[in-house]
């Protein structure tokens, strides 16, 4: 997969703001409940194995975890993944975060997922 290094760097520079509901990611905080509800209306997440591709700081990832899913978040931004890990640890969430490309992860893994976001 081709990744634009400047795009990755842009998100690395602002990744620590993921959980600031009034910061640069404020629109995601507004729509996240809608995204989460849409997904949970389509599939019962309880007990499902979910992968959240391009998870960023983990907003949707954690929402799906709260619905009972076992969630793996993957993102190319190492800073965003670190931010997501720290936030999950603070909340005692058992979420797996992986820094990398989803395509490579899926090619290298024998794990399967019930839901892909």
PLM regions: where:
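N-terminal, positively charged/glycine-rich alpha-helical extensions of SAM-dependent methyltransferases
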Residues: 1-19
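Alpha-helical elements of Rossmann-like donor-binding domains used by nucleotide-donor carbohydrate transfer enzymes
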Residues: 10, 34-38, 83
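Class I SAM-dependent methyltransferase Rossmann-like catalytic core
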Residues: 22-26
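Conserved alpha-helix/loop element of class I SAM-dependent methyltransferases that forms part
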Residues: 29-46
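Structured loop/turn residues at beta-strand edges in well-structured enzyme cores
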Residues: 48, 93, 111
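Conserved class I S-adenosyl-L-methionine
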Residues: 48-54
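Class I SAM-dependent methyltransferase SAM/SAH-binding core
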Residues: 51, 59-104
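A short acidic, Gly/Pro-enriched loop at the edge of an enzyme's catalytic core
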Residues: 107-116
């Amino acid at each position: 997969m081709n990744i634009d290094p400047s795009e990755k760097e842009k998100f690395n520079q602002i990744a620590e703001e993921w959980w600031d509901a009034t910061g640069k990611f404020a629109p995601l905080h507004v729509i996240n409940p809608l995204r989460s509800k849409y997904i949970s209306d389509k599939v019962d997440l309880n007990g499902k194995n979910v992968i959240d591709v391009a998870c960023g700081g983990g907003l949707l990832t954690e929402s799906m975890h709260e619905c009972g899913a076992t969630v793996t978040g993957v993102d190319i931004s190492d800073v965003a993944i670190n931010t997501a890990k720290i936030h999950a640890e603070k909340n005692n969430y058992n979420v797996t975060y992986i820094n990398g490309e989803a395509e490579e992860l899926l090619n290298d893994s024998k794990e399967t997922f019930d839901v892909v976001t």
